[in-house]
Amino acid sequence: FKEDDLLEGTAQPLEDILPQVLAELAPYQEKYGRDIPVFVAGGGLTGEDMARFRGMGAAGVQIATRLIATEECDASQGYKDAILRARGEDVRIIHSPVGMPGRAIYSPLIARMEAGQRQAPQWCAGCIKTCDPAQTPYCITHALIRAVEGDWEEGLFFCGAEVGQVNEMSTVAQVLAEYQAALAQR
């Protein structure tokens, strides 16, 4: 999605995009006699979401935010707590130092960036070619590591749009059981 579409709320929903992608792939599947699996990403939070997208022809659904709040996730409890505390209005579209938009939980780091404060990187790993350490407002590598470690002040806590619906810890088995039950009912 383009950043402006995300900020203005005009990005096409996956329910509109998926049929278009499947239609574009159909001639190639026929020509080469091979199935080309399509996975949707973004918006697959519940079992009902999973069943809906699978029913529309998706081979699968990438899930992320929901799995952060599981016992098995290796992120710190601080990151998990940030996910569990977040409400819908806490989600911001940020312009990352790598030049792409992303959804993140509003945190002190984002507040500082919105106020125009720059946190010059203390070191550079050279991880992204498009990042200029002399100009970047903050080091995304540092901010992501701080988030995984649970540092609320310095972390960049990426999340999905529906993070406000994730309000309790669970296990991966519980999440997958919910998805399987929803798929079995369709």
Where are these predicted regions, by residue range?
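Conserved active-site-proximal phosphate/metal-binding subdomains
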Residues: F1-F39, L45-R186
